[in-house]
């Protein structure tokens, strides 16, 4: 169970880092938002899901 928690935390940190870099790049590009809107929403949905997964796994470990 601890390994699953650690992998979920790593995935959350990696997703956060990717979104931290990619979202400003998408907004700064000229046609970026209209062409990459689905990717940004998918990444945000993944991030929210990982937050809940980490919270659930944390409650099971503690």
Swiss-Prot record:
UniProt xrefs under InterPro entries: PSII_PsbZ, PSII_PsbZ_sf
Keyword match Transmembrane: yes
Annotated keywords: Chloroplast, Membrane, Photosynthesis, Photosystem II, Plastid, Reaction center, Thylakoid, Transmembrane, Transmembrane helix
Main location: plastid
Coiled coil: none
Biological process per Gene Ontology, one example term: photosystem II stabilization
Subcellular localization(s) per the UniProt record: Plastid, Chloroplast thylakoid membrane
UniProt-listed Pfam families: Ycf9
GO cellular component annotations of the record: chloroplast thylakoid membrane; photosystem II reaction center
Transmembrane parts of this sequence: 8-28, 41-61
Topology within the bilayer: Multi-pass membrane protein
Function: May control the interaction of photosystem II (PSII) cores with the light-harvesting antenna, regulates electron flow through the 2 photosystem reaction centers. PSII is a light-driven water plastoquinone oxidoreductase, using light energy to abstract electrons from H(2)O, generating a proton gradient subsequently used for ATP formation.
Complexes and interactors: PSII is composed of 1 copy each of membrane proteins PsbA, PsbB, PsbC, PsbD, PsbE, PsbF, PsbH, PsbI, PsbJ, PsbK, PsbL, PsbM, PsbT, PsbY, PsbZ, Psb30/Ycf12, at least 3 peripheral proteins of the oxygen-evolving complex and a large number of cofactors. It forms dimeric complexes.
Protein family: Belongs to the PsbZ family.
Name this protein carries in UniProt: Photosystem II reaction center protein Z
Taxonomic source organism: Amborella trichopoda
Source taxonomy: Eukaryota, Viridiplantae, Streptophyta, Embryophyta, Tracheophyta
Gene that produces this protein: psbZ
């Amino acid at each position: 169970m601890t390994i699953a928690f650690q992998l979920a935390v790593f995935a959350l940190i990696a997703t956060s880092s990717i979104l931290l870099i990619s979202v400003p790049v998408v907004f700064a590009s000229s046609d970026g938002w209209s062409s990459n809107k689905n990717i940004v929403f998918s990444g945000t949905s993944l991030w929210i899901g990982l937050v809940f997964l980490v919270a659930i796994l944390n409650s099971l470990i503690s």
